[in-house]
Amino acid sequence: MLTKLKNYFLKKNPIFYVDSESIFEEVLKEISGEKILGVDTEFDWRNTYYPNLCLIQISTKKKIFLIDCLRLDSLFKLNLIFENEDIVKVFHSVRSDVTVLFNSLNTKVSNSFDIQIAEKFLSSGDLKSYAKIVLKYLNLNIDKSETNSNWLKRPITESQINYAANDVRFLIKIYLQQKKILERKNSFLAVKNLIKKEIDLGSQELFIPRLKKMKHRKKIEKDLFMWRENIAKERNVPPSYLFKDKNFKKILKIYDENTLREKIYDILQNEKLANNLIESLK
C-alpha cells in the first residue's frame, strides 16, 4: 500500500517513496492512466562509462513518486510509460535525462516536452536553469543545494527528498502555461520538433556524438578512439581512466613514427593494455 512520507504533504503534492516491487507495481498502474507526467532523474556518472541511475522522479498533477532505482530489479517496466505516445512526459533539459534513461533502461522516450527548450524559444535567449523558469512562471524560489549530492548513498536524506521532489513538482504547471502561449503563437509544433531533435541526440550510444566529431580525422585516429571506447565499456570506466586525451596524441605520434613499442608501454603503464592497443592498430 502506498504510504505518504511524513511531513512532505502539507499544502503540497504528497510524496511517495517507491522502494519495493509491490509498491512499484501500484505506481505503474496509477501513472499509466495519466495524460501528463513530470519526469526527472538523479544519477552518478563520475567513475563509470555508463551512468548509474539512482532515482527517477515522476509527478502527476496531484502526486510525486520518488522511485529508488537502487532497490528495484524491474525498472524496465517503466519503458511502457516512457514509450507511450499517449502520455506527455515533461522534462527540464531533456537530453541529459533521456541519455541516462536510454543507456540505463534501453528506452527511447516518446511524446516529450522540455520546458527549457520551450523557454529559450519563447524568450529568444539562452538556456535557463530550472530555478529561473520556476521563478518566472510561478514566482517561487527553490533550493538547489543538493545539485552535487551523492545519490548513491542510502538512506536518502530529508534535504535530498525535498530537492528531488521539487525537481518535478512544478513541471506540469509550467508546461501547461508554456503550451498555451506557444499555441497562441502557432509555435507549439515547432518547439516539439526542436525537442525531438534533442531526444534523438540523447537516445544513442555514448560514443556516437564524439565519433561524429572525428569524421575528418585519419582512420588510425578513429581506430584508436574506438579501441579506447570499447575497453572503457568492457570495464565500465571513463575512457580517460585508460589514458587521457593528451596521451591520445602522443600514442598516435609514436605509432606514426614507428617508434619502439616500449614507449607506448611507458605512456599506458600497462603492458597488457599496450599489447592490446598495438594489435588493434595493425
Where are these regions (language model features)?
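Metal-dependent phosphoesterase core characteristic of DEDDh/y 3'-5' exonuclease domains
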Residues: 57-61, 96-153
